[in-house]
Amino acid sequence: VLQGIGGSLLYVIDQYGETGSLYDAWDEIEGWEEAERKNSVGLEILDHLTHNVRRGEMRTWSGFYNSVFNFEEQKYFDIKGKATGLFSQAMIAPDRAIRIPLNESQDENSQIEEFIRRYNGEGIQHIALTTENIFETVEAMRARGVEFQDTIETYFELIDKRLPGHGEDVERMRKNRILIDGSDEEGLLLQIFTQDTFGPIFFEIIQRKGNEGFGNGNFQALFDSIELDQIRRGVIKVDA
């Protein structure tokens, strides 16, 4: 067991030759398949775990993941809003099976700093889960009462101009507030974020159609959305 960000525990699991891992020896619970069919909304596997860390610690933790687990930097972001900003360094495992983005505030009032105050330290900001059909998944989750972050209407008005020939149903995206990013070369990515679910922690639902990024074009939109909520709540103030 290793100590990770914010005192979290990272468990290293043995592989037992051809027999696999210790999880392969677990007994199945009777009726699990029926329960899964009844309760599933189409979520599949963990895509990434985004962490918020204190100012000056992003490079420390990216170095930790690099030296201990051989993770490499996949992407670096410098995001600025109306009054605040953040740096983000996305790390990826050698087999590309898991990604660990690390966020660090550029100032004392950003959403990263607010998270650290509410969470009482560094920790996971959001958990991203994959789906093969984001429309059906989000509609099923909404029907069960899950609330998602909103996006300004002009975002959807500009999709066809920003990504010509994307082939997605913009009206259904608008109805569900689903974001899109990508290119002809890299493929597409569809994503949406829930409201805070456990304290300041929220979830991301993501469908990858060849794109291995993080919705680079949407990162700014997400930051702006959360910053706008901070302004509305009086956490930060901007000149009129």
Per-region residue spans from a language model:
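Glyoxalase I/VOC metalloenzyme domain signal
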Residues: 1-73, 82-240
